């Protein structure tokens, strides 16, 4: 069977998730990137509960963004998810890049979240 980019991403994500798990003390910051948007969630895997979330589809962000598929938009999502997590008392997270390479939009989101106060 021919290996496609999507199947390679899914394989990488399965490999990553074997070792990554979020707890209530240190939840998982999960990132999903599509061609048009980027989504970030802070997840407690033990309780199976989403604690904070942000995306380029948020009404707060969508108005101020000229394009949702840029590194600048990803950085804004990173700042917003970090602010929402810190408001709920979450400072430490485990970063889950979702099988994507740590480059470009995923990297921009992670660095913006770090600058906003999340530790990972």
Curated annotation (Swiss-Prot):
Family annotation (CDD domains): Ribosomal_L18_L5e
Disordered: region residues: 1-26
Record text on subunit structure and interactions: Part of the 50S ribosomal subunit; part of the 5S rRNA/L5/L18/L25 subcomplex. Contacts the 5S and 23S rRNAs.
Domain of life: Bacteria
Stretches with biased composition (Basic residues): 1-20
Gene3D superfamilies to which the protein is assigned, alphabetical: 3.30.420.100
Family statement drawn from the similarity comment of this UniProt entry: Belongs to the universal ribosomal protein uL18 family.
Described purpose of this protein according to its UniProt entry: This is one of the proteins that bind and probably mediate the attachment of the 5S RNA into the large ribosomal subunit, where it forms part of the central protuberance.
InterPro entries: Ribosomal_uL18_bac-type, Ribosomal_uL18_bac/euk
One GO CC term on file: cytosolic large ribosomal subunit
The keyword Ribosomal protein appears for this protein: yes
One Pfam assignment: Ribosomal_L18p
Organism of derivation: Synechocystis sp. (strain ATCC 27184 / PCC 6803 / Kazusa)
Identification of the protein by name: Large ribosomal subunit protein uL18
